[in-house]
Design a protein with these regions (language model features):
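N-terminus-centered regions that define maturation/targeting leaders and the start
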Residues: 4-193
């Protein structure tokens, strides 16, 4: 015959399992969003487009190191309610030396609908690119490395960041953590070949 404590444990196990599951589900619901869960939000109305290249198409040479090396014109639309500022990161994951950051910009005013070529909206702060300089650095892949993808990531944030212009991408991403309302990605291509 089994002891009373054995039956108490056997009967109590399902109750403990239900309680643990409930606690885990509540913790997951209340946990702050991570960059991964936030940046997968392409279903919002936020959009980033350019008049000079379509998503997945070639970036004109004038916006690269083989041209004027100025940022391409961009249009922003569908900024979600609650947005306090926008941020932009442009990088090349195909770079020979690893992911190369071409441009970071933040505290872009939410009323911004256009980022004109070779300019940024008033109040916008530009950070350090992978060349160690603040501002835009156009695509410049070495010959023989094929077509590179230039990822333009636009973020809608629930706060202004107030970071200094010596901030790099990693510091920018850390500051955005938990404050991303929506994201949209525009991809441009460029090849030296």
């Amino acid at each position: 015959m089994r002891s009373k404590s054995f039956w108490t444990i056997i009967i109590g196990l399902p109750a403990v399992a239900v309680a643990a599951t409930t606690i885990l589900l509540l913790a997951e619901k209340e946990a702050p969003k991570t960059m991964e869960t936030q940046t997968n939000n392409q279903s919002s109305s936020l959009k980033l487009v350019s008049q000079v290249f379509r998503d997945g198409a070639a970036i004109p040479a004038q916006y690269t190191c083989r041209g004027q090396n100025v940022n391409p014109p961009l249009n922003i639309m569908g900024v979600p309610a609650g947005t306090k500022s926008l941020a932009l990161i442009v990088h090349d994951p195909d770079a020979v030396s690893g992911d190369f950051v071409h441009w970071t910009a933040w505290d872009i005013p939410i009323a911004t609908t256009e980022v004109a070529a070779n300019s940024v909206p008033t109040g916008t702060v530009q950070g350090i690119n992978s060349a160690g300089r603040a501002g835009y650095m156009g695509p410049c892949p070495p010959a023989g490395t094929g077509t590179h993808h230039y990822i333009f990531e636009l973020y809608a944030l629930d706060k202004t960041l107030g970071l200094k212009n010596n901030t790099d991408r990693d510091q920018l991403k850390n500051a955005m953590e938990g404050h991303i309302l929506a994201q949209h990605i525009l991809t441009g291509l460029f090849s030296a070949d």
